[in-house]
Amino acid sequence: MLLGRPLSLADLEEIARRGRPVAICAEARERAAASRRAIDAIAAAGDAAPAVYGINTGFGALAETRIADHDIRALQRNLVRSHACGVGPELGEAEVRAMIVLRAQVIALGHSGVRTEVLDLLAALLERRVSPRIPAQGSVGASGDLAPLAHLALTLIGEGEARFEGQLLPSAVALAKAGLAPIELAAKEGLALINGTQYMTALGALALRDAAALCTVADIAGAVSLEALMGSKRPFDERLMRVRPHPGQAGTAGNLRALLGGSEIMQSHADCPRVQDAYSLRCMPQVHGATRDAVAWAAEVLTREVNSVTDNPTVFLGDGADGGAELISGGNFHGQPVALALDLAAMAAAELANISERRVEQLVNPALSTGLTPFLAPHSGLHSGFMIAQVASASLVSENKVLCHPASVDSIPSSAGREDHVSMGSISARKLAQVIENVRSSLAIELITAAQGVDQRLPLRPSAGVAAAHAAIRRVVPGLTEDRPLYRDIAAAAELIQSGALIAAVEEAVGPLN
C-alpha cells in the first residue's frame, strides 16, 4: 500500500488490522522534501525571519510570543512533551496503527514541511510493529487531537512508552529492539505531528468499517428470526423498493430476498390468515436500510478526511507573490465534519440493536412467537431458556441510547479563549466504537435465540441462506437442551460476527450480499 496516494477506509483497515505492508510513494517523498525546504528557508533566516506560527512563535494563546532562533528545536520538543496529557485506557494496536498511517498520509501529501526522515520512521513503526502507548482520553477535537497525537510523537523522539513484541517498554528501548533510532525534531515538526484529526478519524474509520459489516449481519439475523417466527417475505418485494428508492432500503430488501428463497418453513404457512408481521420483521428494509445510508454517508466524510491535510500552518508551494512558498494559518485541524458524521453513525448503528432486541422479544414471548416454547426453553418453568438473554439485549440497547447523545453539540473554550469552539470529535469516535461493540453483542443474542427458534420448527427446513447462518451458529454454539450460562455463547456468536465468518458462510450459500 502506497502512502501519499488516495486511501480508502478498506485500505486503512487492511493496514491497521491485518498488517498490510506500506511504502511511501516517490511523488510523496518529493512533495515532502519540497515543503520541508520552505520551512528550512524560514529557519535559516534565524531571528531575522518573520514570525510564523509554530516555527518561531509559541502555541495557542501564546502564539504572539516570539521564540529565539537558538530555541527552535527545543520549542518542538517541549510542545510534544507538554501536550502528552492523555488519560484513560490504552488504545488497542489496530487503532494506534491507524493513527500512524493517517499521520504519515498527511505528511506525504506534502503540505506539512516535515522531513522525509520523520515520514520514514512512521512507516518503520508500522513495518516493525512498534505501537506507541496512547491513552484514549484527553482530546477535545480542535486544534486537532493534540494529546493522543503527542503520545504518538513521544515515541518518535524516544520518550514515553511503546509496545513491541507484546511488551510495554520505554519508547527508546522499544525502538532499539526494533532496530530503529529516535529523531530530533526540527522546526515545525512537533506541531505538524500533533495538529490534526488523526485520532478521531482512525477510531471512526475502523468503527465505520465494522458498522457496514453489521448492517449485513443484521439482515442475516433478521432473516433467521423471520423464519423462526414464521414471518412473510412479501414486504421485501422489489416493487415496493422501487417506489421508495432509498439505496440502503433496496440493499437490505435484496439481501432478505436472497436469504429467504426456497424455504419449507415459509411455504408451510403461505396460506395462513395472518395479514401482516410486526414492524421489527416487516420494516427491516426501511430501518436497516436507513442505517446503511447513514453509515455510507459517514464513510464518505471519513474517506475525504483520510486524504485531507489537517495541519496548521499549511505549506503551499508556488502560491506566493514571488512564486515561492507560502504558509497559511487556517482551521483544517477542526474536527467538526468528522464529529458530526460519527455522531450520526452512532445513532444509525444503534437502531440495528433497537430493532434486533424487539425481534428477540418476539422470539421469547409466547404470546408473539407463533407456537415457540416460552423463552425457547426445552421445558419452560423448570428451565428459563433465553429469558435473560433478552434482558441483556435490552440493557445494551438502553446503554446505546445514552451513548447516542451527540458529542458534537458540545464545546468548551480552551487555551485562554483562543480556541473558543471545539468539536469533541474524539468523544464521538469513542462513543461510536462502544455503540458498535454493543450492537455486535445484541445481534449475537438475536442469532443464538433465533437459531433455537429454527430448531423448534423442525422437521421443516429453512431457506438455504438461513440454513447456512444456522449451521455457522451451531458450529460455535450448540442448541439449548437445558439451562446453562449463556455468556460464553453470546461471546462466541459475537466473535463469529466480528471475524467475518458468519457473512462468509452465508455468502457461500447464496452469493454476495450487499
Curated annotation (Swiss-Prot):
**Keyword Lyase on entry:** yes
**Where, per the database record, does this protein carry 2,3-didehydroalanine (Ser)?**
S143
Query: Do you know which PANTHER family this protein is assigned to?
Result: HISTIDINE AMMONIA-LYASE (PTHR10362)
- Name-wise, this protein is Histidine ammonia-lyase
Q: Which gene encodes it?
A: hutH
The lineage is: Bacteria, Pseudomonadati, Myxococcota, Polyangia, Polyangiales
Q: Under which pathway is this protein filed?
A: Amino-acid degradation; L-histidine degradation into L-glutamate; N-formimidoyl-L-glutamate from L-histidine: step 1/3
* KW Transmembrane (keyword) present: no
Might you give the EC number(s) for this enzyme? 4.3.1.3
Covalent link (5-imidazolinone (Ala-Gly)) residue numbers:
A142-G144
Q: Single Gene Ontology BP term? A: L-histidine catabolic process to glutamate and formate
List the catalysed reactions. Answer: L-histidine = trans-urocanate + NH4(+)
From which organism does this entry originate? Answer: Sorangium cellulosum (strain So ce56)
The record ties this protein, via Pfam families, to: Lyase_aromatic
